[in-house]
A protein has these predicted regions:
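A terminal-accessory region detector
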Residues: 141-198, 203-206, 430
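Ordered, small/hydrophobic-rich secondary-structure cores
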Residues: 81-105, 109-115, 207-230, 238-240, ...
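Amphipathic alpha-helical substructures
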Residues: 82-170
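Short, contiguous acidic/charged loop-to-helix segments that flank catalytic cores in large enzymes
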Residues: 90-95, 126-128, 174-177, 231-234, ...
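Zinc-dependent metallopeptidase catalytic helix centered on the HExxH motif
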Residues: 1-77
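Terminal connector regions
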Residues: 247-284
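Beta-strand-rich binding/interaction modules
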Residues: 174-257
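Extracytoplasmic
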Residues: 283-489
Length: 489
């Protein structure tokens, strides 16, 4: 009996999951939403209205399924995905989950999320013993909440492609006010695609000081802290500035279901030396698109055809040379050959990617070729990031880490050595140089520094355990992006 019972339970669980769940057959139309126009609408709206579990302040990594979803939605609409039997059920379920969460963010940009949740509860209670058709649901939704679902769902089901959101100039300032600390998060965002997108700002709803006062310095370790959330639709081609008051010290900006990878920009308030502001205005504001253009600036990213890799003296590949080749990203940082990775601290739009490898003898190289069209003096920058892992202990910023750059053209050839552990993340200057019209190459070789066993890791987010302290520490070499900025004479 026990064996048969377990088999039955296992089969039951399988039949209740995925695109082909049999549970609706037993609802007797008590909580199932049906529509001939929008297939699987019940599953989509179930995800959208499950607002209680869609937001956290936890850090998430890019999963292989995220990349699969992006590649699929670049080529197919949701309606086409539903009828494409060549796609796995697992991928289609993942797409529906992300589409549902994205729909929730779109709706929350117009209607308070708590009102959305209460509306779904009222509908379920009101039609407890009746069939719920989507037409009736949409009619009540517009009557009670003032929003027409039809055009929104038409776009969800018919749109091919994803929004590409250029988020920049992220800034956190402390608001000058009495009481507990408050912070103003501001940033600019431009939608460089022809598909509408949505931005979500999320932050803790209380500072650590407030929580200590509420719980008398005995904050429960499993406390489910409340969050402050605001969603904004960023129309195709729009340029906006967003201002968001943070009541806590941590939060993030999410680009939701977009071509951006990773989809989140994490915010951690550093109180020491923070700038102050009296501005307490929050919302979304139109800005000039010229704010996103930088005259006299040339950037070559690792995703460019002007970027090349060399492993052990042999040219490797141009990463985007073969457009039809499937992109493969890895979260493995200790390879002896160049490996393409996605990290939240890399440069790139829409994919924040870079190449990394273990330090070698100088045979491995990353080469950026920049076409200078106007002669003059330029300042050359490279994009630097802190990247570490504990097993085995490798880091881009161990004490003693060095980066060996070479800047050259037909008349210039200069070497620059950078102490990687002593410079900040982001754009770091390699110096100013006079360039004539033509090609300039910036070359990074894989020589590192002399990393001792007692070297410290400047990336304070990583703690090396005692079992790993006996392993040799190795430097990571990271190749991301370079920038030339014309210097005004």
């Amino acid at each position: 009996y026990g064996v048969e019972r377990m088999r039955l339970l296992a089969c039951g669980m399988l039949l209740q999951q995925g695109m082909y769940s049999i549970l609706p057959m037993y609802y007797d139309y008590t909580s199932f939403l049906s529509s001939a126009t929008y297939p699987a609408i019940n599953m989509l709206l179930s995800e959208a209205f499950a607002l209680k579990g869609r937001l956290t302040v936890g850090r998430s990594l890019v999963r292989p399924s995220d990349i699969e979803v992006v590649e699929c939605l670049k080529k197919k609409s949701l309606r086409e995905i539903l009828s494409d039997d060549s796609l796995s059920d697992k991928l289609r379920v993942e797409i529906f989950k992300l589409q549902g969460k994205n729909l929730a963010s779109i709706l929350s940009a117009f209607v308070n999320p708590d009102e959305l949740y209460r509306f779904s509860e009222r509908i379920a209670s009101r039609f407890q013993f009746d069939e719920i058709t989507f037409d009736r649901f949409a009619e009540d939704f517009q009557l009670e909440l003032g929003l027409d679902l039809i055009p929104i769902l038409d776009r969800v089901y018919q749109t091919v492609g994803l929004a590409i959101l250029d988020v920049r100039d992220i800034r956190v300032e402390q608001v000058v006010t009495e009481g507990y600390p408050r912070y103003l998060l501001s940033f600019k965002v431009r939608n460089i695609s022809d598909v509408d997108g949505v931005i979500t700002c999320v932050a803790d709803n209380q500072t650590i000081e407030e929580l200590r006062d509420v719980y008398k310095n005995a904050i429960p370790p499993d406390l489910d802290a409340s969050l402050k959330v605001q969603d904004y639709v960023i129309a195709a081609g729009a340029c906006k500035e967003v201002k968001f008051i943070m009541y806590g010290d941590c939060g993030y900006i999410s680009t939701n279901l977009s071509a951006n990878l990773p989809r989140e920009y994490y915010i951690e308030v550093v109180r020491e030396g923070i700038s102050k502001t009296c501005d307490q205005c929050e919302g979304i504001f139109d800005i000039d698109s010229n704010l996103f253009h930088e005259p006299g600036v040339i950037i070559v990213d690792n995703a460019s055809s002007q970027f090349q890799l060399v492993d052990s003296g042999q040219p490797k590949r141009l990463p985007f040379f073969a457009k039809e080749q499937k992109k493969v990203y890895k979260m493995v940082f200790d390879n002896v050959e160049w490996t393409e990775i996605i990290t939240s601290t890399s440069y790139g739009i829409p994919v924040q990617s870079a190449f990394c490898k273990l330090a070698g003898e100088g045979n491995g190289k990353a080469i950026w070729t920049v076409n200078v069209q106007k002669a003059g003096k330029y300042e050359v920058f490279f994009y630097h990031q802190f990247l570490s892992m504990t097993g085995p202990p490798v880091s881009s910023v161990f004490t003693g880490s060095l980066l060996h750059y070479r800047i050259c053209n037909e008349v210039l050839d200069e070497n620059v050595v950078v102490e990687a552990d002593l410079v900040p993340e982001g754009w770091v200057s390699l110096g100013k140089f006079d360039f004539s019209v033509g090609e300039v190459q910036v070359i990074l070789d894989d020589r590192g520094g002399n990393i001792r066993m007692d070297a410290e890791d400047q990336n304070l987010n990583v703690i090396v355990s005692s079992t790993e302290q006996s392993l040799p520490k190795r430097q990571l070499i990271i190749a991301d992006a370079v920038k030339l900025v014309r210097v005004k004479e």
